[in-house]
């Protein structure tokens, strides 16, 4: 009897696979983007070996498909991630992520005086890329922040 020491994440018949997520980011994506707000099966792989990243996370959601806009919002956290649409166990579409112009209802403004932190409004940021740096400008307080500052506020 041979023993295979390699564990594999089960293939899905139909749905979305988010691959090449940096390690330790998978759970954050599940929470921020409310990916668990479904009764469909979700498979999560954490700290999986990756030639490109060293370690990576992976999320598979059955019978659920992300729009291009939803997929691009993931780029703030996982710029090199790929979002694959699966049908009948085959990849039928691969989305390469790009930064969106706006991110709404996902991030929290780090400005403690911003109205979005105390009033029932959806957060909204415009995304600006200058010289390889990504900045986010809050729609409400109009302050601009380096993207890492906003990502850490969540």
Swiss-Prot record:
Q: How is the cofactor bound?
A: Binds 1 zinc ion per subunit.
Q: Which UniProt keywords apply?
A: Metal-binding, Pyrimidine biosynthesis, Zinc
The family database entries (Gene3D superfamilies) matched by this protein are listed as:
Aspartate carbamoyltransferase regulatory subunit, C-terminal domain, Aspartate carbamoyltransferase regulatory subunit, N-terminal domain
Membrane-crossing segments per the record: none
Q: Which GO terms describe its cellular component?
A: aspartate carbamoyltransferase complex
Among Pfam families, the record links this protein to: PyrI (PF01948), PyrI_C (PF02748)
Q: Does the keyword Iron apply?
A: no
Q: Give me any GO biological process, just one.
A: pyrimidine nucleotide biosynthetic process
Give the signal peptide as a residue range, or say none if absent.
Answer: none
Cofactors (names): Zn(2+)
Q: Which domain of life is it from?
A: Bacteria
Summarize where Zn(2+) binds, as residue positions: 109, 114, 138, 141
Q: Looking at the keywords, is Protease present?
A: no
Q: Name one GO molecular function term.
A: metal ion binding
Subunit architecture:
Heterododecamer (2C3:3R2) of six catalytic PyrB chains organized as two trimers (C3), and six regulatory PyrI chains organized as three dimers (R2).
Function recorded in the entry: Involved in allosteric regulation of aspartate carbamoyltransferase.
The record, for HAMAP family, names: Asp_carb_tr_reg
Belongs to which family? Belongs to the PyrI family.
What is the protein's name according to its record? Aspartate carbamoyltransferase regulatory chain
